[in-house]
């Protein structure tokens, strides 16, 4: 299973973190054949952290993870 990990900085403002989660959901709706799962991860201030997200990838059986940095 190939996972796209959308990595953002994270914010103390919950609204900003929700925007990243929403973006990950929108990318997943495109049904890009290369990725079975799209999930967000955050550098700081929000969950899941990058490490937690990679652990989640292992739990769901990912065989490949592509990290897409999304920093503004």
Residues covered by each model-derived region:
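Active-site-proximal alpha-helix that buttresses catalytic centers in soluble enzyme cores
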Residues: 1-72
């Amino acid at each position: 299973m190939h996972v796209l990990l959308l990595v953002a900085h994270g914010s103390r403002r919950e609204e900003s973190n929700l925007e990243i989660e929403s973006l990950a959901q929108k990318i997943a709706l495109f049904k890009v054949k290369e990725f079975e799962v799209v999930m967000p991860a955050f550098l700081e201030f929000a969950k899941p952290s990058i490490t937690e997200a990679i652990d989640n990838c292992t739990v769901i059986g990912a065989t490949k993870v592509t990290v897409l940095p999304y920093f503004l």
